[in-house]
């Protein structure tokens, strides 16, 4: 029976183009981790034998909760496929490696996990010099309603990130009566698209800097805080901004 199980596993790996070591040992090829407030952590380990382990842990002075999910996956170029079963936490069939994150793109809710270590080189981020204050998210109408019309997700270049920053500075300068902080005090979350006219539009969510990296994991939403939190739309093709919303305004 043991031999039969090994044969079945080998056939499964061959079918999905996965690499299995002859001695059945496995090498970690990707390690990703998010650290949240209140001692909450999620980790994803992906191995060369086409297996993965996802771990979610929460700690409290009174208890500790740890959950583990195991399954199979394989990597092709910059895409990770979860077969024959979806990634259980989000019911995703695939994820993409983008801007040093594993980004689950087809699940029941958006999830990004920051890559900490790989055994292969990653593409350099377009905004590598500003990665401590910028985080880009891929538009999906299922998750985000900042764009209503038929648009396509768009990846900003380093040049476009710099142009975006100039327009953010301009916005603050032109609204001094409501905005008192320089742009350097904000962490920026951006969603970029190309509209039907071929113009590059960007929704920008700005929040006062925090010590943690949570702004890189998901879009943050605050109900108060005044000009510590604001968002707007920027049209890079026209060099204009619109729909400025500052927390605390009616």
Residue map of PLM features:
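Sec-dependent N-terminal signal peptides
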Residues: 4-14
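Lipid interaction determinants
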Residues: 18-68, 81-122
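Short, exposed beta-strand/loop patches in secreted or surface proteins that constitute
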Residues: 44-45, 71-74, 92-97, 187-195
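A mature extracytoplasmic/lumenal domain signature
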Residues: 56-58, 84-87, 206-210, 234-238, ...
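A short, structured loop/turn motif at beta-sheet edges
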Residues: 72-79, 194-200, 234-240
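C-terminal partner/receptor-binding element of secreted or periplasmic proteins
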Residues: 103-120, 225-250
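N-terminal secretory signal peptides
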Residues: 125-193
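Functional cores of ribonucleases/endoribonucleases
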Residues: 172-229, 233
